[in-house]
């Protein structure tokens, strides 16, 4: 019986497999010592290549209608584990080890929650290679300009991102409304930013700074209770224009800014 894609799970499977899948394997630097977490394996197109190349692969799939297909294809593989659960709810510590690498075509409608889940488990996950909407990929990897936002800085706080390549929408079934991007996130081995400023403080200021993207940094930071004069004084100390928008401020400048506000 033909599989019916479910909109509620954001299912868009690759149909021009070889060209894209081989490129994914190549840029993800797969080797036989890798332990892989694949989120949303679908019908197992990427899984088929990974399972033959890595030490261990754990696939997390929410759609029960795909369980039989996946078990039939891969249950004989000793290095393969299928977890039929919602990736946002599952305790990944039960299934993956330190040094795990994520390689996945993730459901686009929950991109941010999945990235947050990966970040929450960064003590186990060293690197993530994921397919996302092109626009989201550009935002995550943007070094400056209007594409930058809270998600950009959230990723930068924990690791380095890179836009690897674009995948046209025609390569998927059903064809989505947008092109896709394959990106990487490599987590820092040290806590380079966490050692400078806590997560709570960092995100408190970043969320305020981006609370209204049409407003400049001064008008957004007043939501934290500071006067405009105080904000302008501190911005002047670190050579940021009072008319600047948050999207044009680097993570290092943000941390410098927060430290002054917090008297550190």
UniProtKB/Swiss-Prot annotation:
PANTHER family given in the database record: DIMETHYLADENOSINE TRANSFERASE (PTHR11727), DIMETHYLADENOSINE TRANSFERASE-RELATED (PTHR11727:SF7)
Encoding gene, per UniProt annotation: rsmA
Entry's localization field: Cytoplasm
Protein known as: Ribosomal RNA small subunit methyltransferase A
A GO CC term attached to the entry: cytosol
Enzyme class: transferase
Protein's organism: Fusobacterium nucleatum subsp. nucleatum (strain ATCC 25586 / DSM 15643 / BCRC 10681 / CIP 101130 / JCM 8532 / KCTC 2640 / LMG 13131 / VPI 4355)
Keyword presence, rRNA processing: yes
Keyword Methyltransferase: yes
Key words, A-Z: Cytoplasm, Methyltransferase, RNA-binding, rRNA processing, S-adenosyl-L-methionine, Transferase
InterPro entries associated with the record: KsgA/Erm, rRNA_Ade_diMease-like_C, rRNA_Ade_Mease_Trfase_CS, rRNA_Ade_methylase_Trfase_N, rRNA_adenine_dimethylase, SAM-dependent_MTases_sf
Domain of life: Bacteria
Similarity comment: Belongs to the class I-like SAM-binding methyltransferase superfamily. rRNA adenine N(6)-methyltransferase family. RsmA subfamily.
GO terms under biological process: rRNA methylation
Sequence positions that bind S-adenosyl-L-methionine: 12, 14, 40, 61, 86, 105
Enzyme Commission number(s): 2.1.1.182
Catalysed reaction, written as an equation: adenosine(1518)/adenosine(1519) in 16S rRNA + 4 S-adenosyl-L-methionine = N(6)-dimethyladenosine(1518)/N(6)-dimethyladenosine(1519) in 16S rRNA + 4 S-adenosyl-L-homocysteine + 4 H(+)
Function in brief: Specifically dimethylates two adjacent adenosines (A1518 and A1519) in the loop of a conserved hairpin near the 3'-end of 16S rRNA in the 30S particle. May play a critical role in biogenesis of 30S subunits.
A GO term, aspect molecular function: RNA binding
